[in-house]
Amino acid sequence: MAASALAWLLLWAAGLVGRLAADISDARFSDGVRATCSEIILRQEFLKDGFHRDLLIKVKFGESIEDLQTCRLLIKHYIPTGLFVDPYELASLRERNITEAVMVSESFNLEAPNYLSTESAVLIYARQDAQCIDCFQAFLPVHYRYHRPHKKDGDTLIVVNNPDLLMHCDQEFPILKCWAQSEVAAPCSLKSEEICQWKNMQYKSILKNLTVQVPVGLTIHTSLVCSVTLLITVLCSTLILLAVFKYGHFSL
């Protein structure tokens, strides 16, 4: 009886040691594969000045990508309430082959001010950079929304979070196994209704978050602005009426 129990104990111990060795081997293999993976670097910046900006997104892969020609990159960006993207402008840009972006938010109001709007989502199919073999870039025009006037500070800060980086390749690459976190279903291309499984990629961002300052009005100027607006409205209406009575031709 004791010998049987001892034999079972030895078998259990051997199995445990085998599993631990396998786990350690897998962990070392995973660490080795990850160690050979170069980082995916994402950078986004605003171009132009004023209330109408261009958001430029650049993605650089390391040398572990052997052939990017078989891969497609999709950027899912979440536009904060302080900004908006014009879907009609996007349609015009798509027709001219300037960018490949489409709104995915169903309820969207272009005219809503910042405090009445909601976050919106945009899908941008990035294109390979002709000047960089391992680079993609995407372009998205954005516009400022109207903000409430402030009591003291004449500026407000808008924070643009980092986007989701999705990748789909016709063949497997080591980097996909290294940095893929999950799979996301999305259209294979802008002109296709076919759904592909995209890998949500982990990356390193140059900036933690992109920020931009928006000038806003001051509440202390409310009475002045209202008075001047009313005065100009009355003056222009009077001039229009005088011109109508002076140069207009009336017949009874």
Swiss-Prot record:
Pathway listed for it?
Answer: Glycolipid biosynthesis; glycosylphosphatidylinositol-anchor biosynthesis
Sugar-bearing residues? N97, N209
- Please state the span of the N-terminal signal peptide per the UniProt entry: 1-22
Q: How does it sit in the membrane?
A: Single-pass type I membrane protein
Chief localisation class: endoplasmic reticulum
Q: Which Pfam families match?
A: PIG-X
Q: Give the UniProt keywords, A-Z.
A: Endoplasmic reticulum, Glycoprotein, GPI-anchor biosynthesis, Membrane, Signal, Transmembrane, Transmembrane helix
GO BP terms: namely: GPI anchor biosynthetic process
What InterPro entries does the record tag this protein with? PIG-X/PBN1, PIGX
Endoplasmic reticulum as a keyword of this entry, yes or no, is: yes
A GO CC annotation given for this chain: endoplasmic reticulum membrane
**Per the UniProt record, which residue ranges are transmembrane?**
225-245
- Localization per Swiss-Prot or TrEMBL: Endoplasmic reticulum membrane
What does it do? Stabilizing subunit of the glycosylphosphatidylinositol-mannosyltransferase I complex which catalyzes the transfer of the first mannose, via an alpha-1,4 bond from a dolichol-phosphate-mannose (Dol-P-Man) to the glucosaminyl acyl phosphatidylinositol (GlcN-(acyl)PI) intermediate to generate alpha-D-Man-(1->4)-alpha-D-GlcN-(1->6)-(1-radyl,2-acyl-sn-glycero-3-phospho)-2-acyl-inositol and participates in the sixth step of the glycosylphosphatidylinositol-anchor biosynthesis. Probably acts by stabilizing the mannosyltransferase PIGM.
Q: How does it assemble?
A: Part of the glycosylphosphatidylinositol-mannosyltransferase I complex that is composed of PIGM and PIGX. Interacts with PIGM; PIGX stabilizes PIGM.
Q: From the Swiss-Prot or TrEMBL record, give the protein name.
A: GPI alpha-1,4-mannosyltransferase I, stabilizing subunit
Q: Which organism is it from?
A: Rattus norvegicus (Rat)
Q: Which gene encodes it?
A: Pigx
